[in-house]
Curated annotation (Swiss-Prot):
PROSITE patterns: DEHYDROQUINASE_II. It comes from Bacillus pumilus (strain SAFR-032). This is 3-dehydroquinate dehydratase. The active site is at Y23 (proton acceptor), H100 (proton donor). It catalyses: 3-dehydroquinate = 3-dehydroshikimate + H2O.
Amino acid sequence: MPHFLVLNGPNLNRLGKREPAVYGSKTLTDLETDLFQFAERANIQLTFFQSNHEGDLIDALHEAEEQYDGVVFNPGAFTHYSYALRDAIASISLSVVEVHISNVHKREEFRHHSVLAPVCQGQIVGLGLEGYKLAIRYLVSEGGAVS
C-alpha cells in the first residue's frame, strides 16, 4: 500500500479562520479527515504533519525519505524564499508535489515565484483543497520515487 506524507507549512493550521474568501471555510482537520477518507477508499496510507517552523519542515522532508513513497507539500509562504527547503527537497530521492490552495499567480506579485517548484515533480495551484487529492493521484500513478 503506498504511503505518502502530506506536509503543510506556516499558517495552514489557520485554515477556516484565515482569509476564508481565499482559502475557504474548511479547517486543517476537515482537510485531513477528507483526505483520510479519500485515501482509505483508494487503499493509500497518509500521514499528516503541519508546522509553522522551517526547520521542522526540513526535518520532516529528510525523515520522509526512509518512511514514505512521496510527499504532498503545501509550503505556504516559504515557497517564495526558502532556499533551505529547496535544498531539503533536492536532497531526497522522493517525488514532492507542491500544492497551493489559492491561485498564487492571481495574487500579490511576491507570490508569483516559487523557489521550490524547480526541485519538485510538479506544482498544483488554485484548485482549492482538491489540489491535495490531485497530487496524491499523481504520486500513486508514478510510484512516488524520483526517476
